[in-house]
Amino acid sequence: MRLYVYILQAKDLPAKETFAKLHVGRHKSKTRVARDTSSPIWNEEFVFRISDVDEGDDVVVSILHHEQQDHQSIVSTGLIGKVRIPLTSVAAEENQTLLPTWFVIEKPSDGKFVNIECGKILLSLSLQGKWESTSGEKVLNDKQDIINLEGVKELEGSPKDLISSRDGKRRKHHDGKHIMKNIVNHIDKLFHKKEEISKRLHDESSVGQSVNSNYEDATDQCSSSATCTGFEEGLDLMQSSDSEREEMPENLTGGVLVDQKYLVSPCELNKFLFTPSSQFRKELAELQGLSDVQEGPWTMMQEDTPRLTRVVTYMRAATKMVKAVKATENQVYRKASGKQFAVFVSVSTPDVPYGNTFKIELLYKILPETEPTAGGEASRLIISWGIQFSQSTIMKGMIEGGARQGLKESFEQFSNLLAKTYKTLDPAVVLDKEQVIATVQSEPKTDLKSAFLYFWSSSVICAVLLSVYVVVHMLHCEPSKIQGFEFYGLDLPDSFGELFSSGILVLLLERVYIMTVHFVQARLHRGRDQGVKANGKGWILTIALIKGTNLASVEATELFDPYVVFTCNGKTRTSSVKLQAQDPQWNEVIEFDAMEEPPSVLDVEVFDFDGPFDQGASLGHAEINFLKHTADELADLSVALVGNHAQASQSKLQLRIFLENKNGVETMKDYLSKVEKEVGKKLNIRSPQKNSAFQKLFGLPHEEFLLKEYTCYLKRKLPVQGKLFLSARIVAFYSNVFGHKTKFYFLWEDIDDIQVLPPTFASLGSPLLLIILKKNRGLDAKHGAKSQDDEGRLSFYFQSFVSFDATSRTIMALWKTRTLSVDHRAQIVEEDQDVADPFLLPEAVTVVSDADALMMSKVYTCDLPCDVELVMKIFGGGELERKIMEKSGCLSYASTTWESKKPGVYERRLSYKYNHYVSVFGGGVTCAQQKSPAPNDEGWILNEIVALHDVPFGDHFRVHIRYEVKKAGVDCKTSKCEVYLKIRWLKTIKFEQRISKSIMEKFRNRFKVIFDLFQKESVANSSLTLL
């Protein structure tokens, strides 16, 4: 036998987040969670296989309340009530079918719903034998049609009433199969039968309760909650009730699967995707291998806000891991305003492993595209996903990963198929630079029109009228006689009235004169940067200044003449002056010359024009960070101005900004080449995968590229281990320690100073790199700073680098390169042009600290029968040094002269090649040497950094050498030389131990050869001196 249980709906429940749980013997199942409603509609079917109908077997339907505690799990908070139906009562019905009946939910014995009316639930049950295996589906269809079309009168009563009336008091109904086939012919019989049932139940009730059985009430209840309606009619109904008051739902937590713009209106795209029997859905099902696709009709849920809903079922094709499974989609319109649509889809797959523990959620959002397009109306489709777990499981991570991968592959096919029908719009197509510029410049204002608007004021009109009036008066009057203190050529006022009139006329004419001069100056100041094309190749910044709104002057009563100054990478561009305009309309295009590296910040400031030599009062300013805006956002940006009066007036500027690279990959290579000269170290271009991960981690635009990354500790109250990232425009840090994430970045331009602090006990013997930001800069990274000084400067401490010296030098060099002024950069380029440096060392020379010296190994020591000054001639750069080095196997030996960097400290550089006796690979060598007096003037200490080129793994390490040449005897005629050596690894390799051993042996032998040659050459020179 098979038991079919249909849980249709409930009403008047005391909670809004509910679901029904079904128990039949040892079998259990449950419905989906109905959200935000106390009258849920489930319309779900459950089938159980039972061996026999016993007296003690009951069907128990429990209604439970669920509460969502976080984004991933849902925990039940209490039992609302139960309904218990004996199977024997169902078997005693005609055709063993209990038609849809309202049951009163029994109150629980404990919990928070004990003394509350728990509502009612509409159920239908049917028992089918093996010979009627296909009748279950027919019964379900019968019940749904009865609910929607005919219905039954509400049967109000507890299950106990049903038990007491099961002997000889059964309700008589027509067979559902005949109702489905002949529903129209049997309407009268059905109503007649219902009246007989109602009368008989009223007369024969053994417990004295009045039990009604008219299914029309049930029909009314169901119809008020779910009404069959057409798709377009339902959308019109939702649109009429939407009234733009419902907000568009946020994207689901799992992430965005599709975010694409299409050249089609939102309404047409919505119909194309969700209309019944959509051809697109059929083609997609065929492409994805779906079968037995059954789309239910769109029905209207009559809640506080009417919502269209339907159920779609299909079979997913079998894969290598999972067999063919049935999936059920519940699609609900969350918003339909005519221009914006949101469809929420809940997908249940109970047949997959752990399928009863989770449901996949999808959210389709269709939005109108506000940007101008060349092809007409456009829309944006965003599809996000999430997963809801009804119970916890240890396979949660694996389920999420599998769902993410499967959805990604499915919606790639979805996007590709949709793109065959509607043209997709790239961001560059949506807002094409040339098109926008052409639009901005299409309606330029003439000077005549600007002059008319400027001079059309009361003061100018009064001055003109009064001047005309005086001139006409003069033409009609005879010349006055000379009297008083007048003389020929001087006519004075003869009364106070004449004096007053003359004064007014003079003041008005003065005002007109000042306005005229101001207008001429503004015209001369106009557009000196407007329309000037950018020069060179590199990063081109183009700004279309559209308009300003609600600009406020320092003096509220005065009119002002605004103009805008743009500053980027030390260069400025100025717009034209708009005379006496609170809402100026510029429509101007300004371009900056090509830049070698992408700019970080654009400073915008609005001034009140006050003559050609004065800057004027500021009306507001703003800073646009290119790293915090996408290309789409920059293409249509409304900038809020900052300032006392600007913020109070909500002043804004509308800009369209385009940043593009005119030189392609060569721009990046040129930038790296310039940085390498400053850093003194080879910088490799990172892989696209690393660059993409870096951009995604910090939300950076695609043009930002990674230069270096280092593992280190960020020092705060407790050190935090993470990675320090260096890119062309930012310094970034990221850490994830047991799920606690620390992430921030700041601009190179925000750095005020970088200091290297000596090791301390608190830093575990590691030097500290201190980065201090400028005042009130980098406030977004404040949570990563260790302290903030009295001036408002943030301090960041980094420690425990693998190679502290190389890291600190690289960071210092990048900072200096980025913060150099434009003129200084040009000067450096001119000086370095066409100059090759054979002594270029991958790292700059540095003093080996005492702490580093303690870690160096002594590889050679010798006593020399000569004083310290003679020994130091080995490094003197003279003929003796050249002979020794050539005989020891150095070819093309060249050295610079010793230069004093600071008192007592001298530096020089060397360049040579090894012959094949010294190294089978040959290879070049560059060295940097630094010498300084030893303590107490006992001799000299010379530090040397050696870089090997054109040898295997030569770029993975550097050799640090320290020579200590000191006095050995009391008479100062003998000396002692000790040589220490250390290998500093820049990159980790498996052959470190082998290479270190080889270098130690080679250099030990080399030092012996050099000092033996020195003793021979010194003895020979002494003999020649004696002769």
Swiss-Prot record:
The keyword Oxidoreductase does not apply. This is C2 and GRAM domain-containing protein At5g50170. It is found in: Membrane. Residues 206-223 have a biased composition (Polar residues). It comes from Arabidopsis thaliana (Mouse-ear cress). Its main location: membrane. Residues 158-167 have a biased composition (Basic and acidic residues). One of its GO terms (cellular component) is membrane. Residues 1-103, 516-639 form the C2 domain. Residues 253-426, 855-1018 form the VASt domain. The chain crosses the membrane at residues 452-472. The keyword Phosphoprotein does not apply.
